[in-house]
Amino acid sequence: MIRITDTAQEHFAKLLANQEEGTQIRVFVINPGTPTAECGVSYCPPDAVEATDTELKFEKLSAYIDELSKPYLDDAEIDFVTDQLGSQLTLKAPNAKMRKVDDNAPLMERVEYVLQSQINPQLAGHGGRVTLMEITDDSLAILQFGGGCNGCSMVDVTLKEGIEKELLQKFPELKGVRDLTEHQRGEHSYY
């Protein structure tokens, strides 16, 4: 379910030592399963534990997860990273915006999951996104770019060298990827 690294557990243990006795942490997702999903960690005093919560016991603490957030925190990882710029807590939850789909789910669902959980987070750095419009009878994934990708001069490279390569590697049943977008360069374009 959730992995909390040893360094993150040490960090939380230090913080929890200054809290009311019995206080643990709560890991949650606000707006789970949507493009605006956000993950968080908060203190969870004993009186805030709900009967429907799931308790995950770790060596130095327990983490509580509410029933609604639980499926969206599959494969999540909390780490405490130190580099030249300082230290920071990181929470990676690849399934927060979209629940992980089963390996034998329909191809459309599996491709959509990869786009939302792996491709779109990379495109978001440039204000872009991609949407799966359909999978044709001849096994072509038809995509539409939006945001900063629409009109971007690099969209063909992104499509062929990035997205298409990744999708064809993950889904051998696909024959190719096509772009449905009419690219008109504008103020929103990244390049």
Curated annotation (Swiss-Prot):
The keyword DNA damage does not apply. Involved in iron-sulfur cluster biogenesis. Binds a 4Fe-4S cluster, can transfer this cluster to apoproteins, and thereby intervenes in the maturation of Fe/S proteins. Could also act as a scaffold/chaperone for damaged Fe/S proteins. Belongs to the NfuA family. GO terms for biological process: iron-sulfur cluster assembly; protein maturation. [4Fe-4S] cluster binds at C149, C152. PANTHER family: FE_S BIOGENESIS PROTEIN NFUA, IRON-SULFUR CLUSTER SCAFFOLD PROTEIN NFU-RELATED. Gene3D superfamilies: Fe-S cluster assembly (FSCA), HesB-like domain. It comes from the Bacteria. Its cofactor is [4Fe-4S] cluster. Keywords: 4Fe-4S, Iron, Iron-sulfur, Metal-binding. This is Fe/S biogenesis protein NfuA. Homodimer. One of its GO terms (molecular function) is 4 iron, 4 sulfur cluster binding. Binds 1 [4Fe-4S] cluster per subunit. The cluster is presumably bound at the interface of two monomers. HAMAP family: Fe_S_biogen_NfuA (MF_01637).
